[in-house]
Amino acid sequence: MIEFDNLTYLHGKPQGTGLLKANPEDFVVVEDLGFEPDGEGEHILVRILKNGCNTRFVADALAKFLKIHAREVSFAGQKDKHAVTEQWLCARVPGKEMPDLSAFQLEGCQVLEYARHKRKLRLGALKGNAFTLVLREVSNRDDVEQRLNDICVKGVPNYFGAQRFGIGGSNLQGAQRWAQTNTPVRDRNKRSFWLSAARSALFNQIVAERLKKADVNQVVDGDALQLAGRGSWFVATTEELAELQRRVNDKELMITAALPGSGEWGTQREALAFEQAAVAAETELQALLVREKVEAARRAMLLYPQQLSWNWWDDVTVEIRFWLPAGSFATSVVRELINTTGDYAHIAE
């Protein structure tokens, strides 16, 4: 299995180094749910600004403040502890008057707004995230500048970031041990983290191998293509390749790679044979996913950061802003820019 740091680059290995997250203010994330609170209902959506505390810790503190069980507070995604982040929490408080959440106090956390909502906020139920990153001690400004311009045109590999695999790869290692021993895992969180790490690692492997072999944006017979921003896909046939290639070049269509699991992967013929060969050595992880009934799915191979802009504060410091759809990783953008001395594994999704 290819380690995250050794995955194939789209724009070649960066020529310079830099520091990511010298302090929390260098990594700012603003969650974009893609909808507004309903203004009524048994739930309360709470937008918080936090620095130095993780999402679960804040959710538990909010539950305690509201005198409800911790499971009654949900969120769309974990946000990094060592960053400045804005996100929404959702508390189920039926049949009660609206509590005064301005009285909620927690070090490093501030309530920005809150309102009633009809539905529970579920994990993954967000449109995306806006990022503002500051890279410091950049050793090669010209290389980073060129790469930023190239990313505007060609995007970056849509890899799952190192944080998906746990600190030191602990989640992937757990999945590998589980796959080898077939010992039942009772802890639901471990099961979820380990299965997610296994499937993500296989996806990364497929994308890395495709980048090695050919132009990642070259449509081949049997590729599974999806409309940009959509989840469904269709299979490319030889007769359609020229037209489909035009639509891919125009970023109307995205070529996908497999998220292996039970059931058909979605590709056929040449594309399917390539994907199967790319992960042929990982039979135990594949068998684990099938055994645990994790359904196969698809994910775009490339990621195009939206609203990408940057500003050089000086020759060694650059502020970069962009928006990514849910499930994408800012670290997969950063790794195409610099060899970073920051710690990827501590950056939450």
Curated annotation (Swiss-Prot):
The keyword Isomerase applies. InterPro entries: PsdUridine_synth_cat_dom_sf, PsdUridine_synth_TruD, PsdUridine_synth_TruD_CS, PsdUridine_synth_TruD_insert, TruD_catalytic, TruD_insert_sf, TruD_pseudoU_synthase. GO terms for biological process: tRNA pseudouridine synthesis. Its EC number is 5.4.99.27. SUPFAM superfamilies: Pseudouridine synthase. Keywords: Isomerase, tRNA processing. PROSITE patterns: TRUD, UPF0024. The keyword RNA-binding does not apply. It holds the Pfam family TruD. It is an enzyme of class 5 (isomerase). It catalyses: uridine(13) in tRNA = pseudouridine(13) in tRNA. CDD domains: PseudoU_synth_EcTruD. The active site is at residue 80. Residues 155-303 form the TRUD domain. HAMAP family: TruD. This is tRNA pseudouridine synthase D. It comes from Escherichia coli O9:H4 (strain HS). The gene is truD.
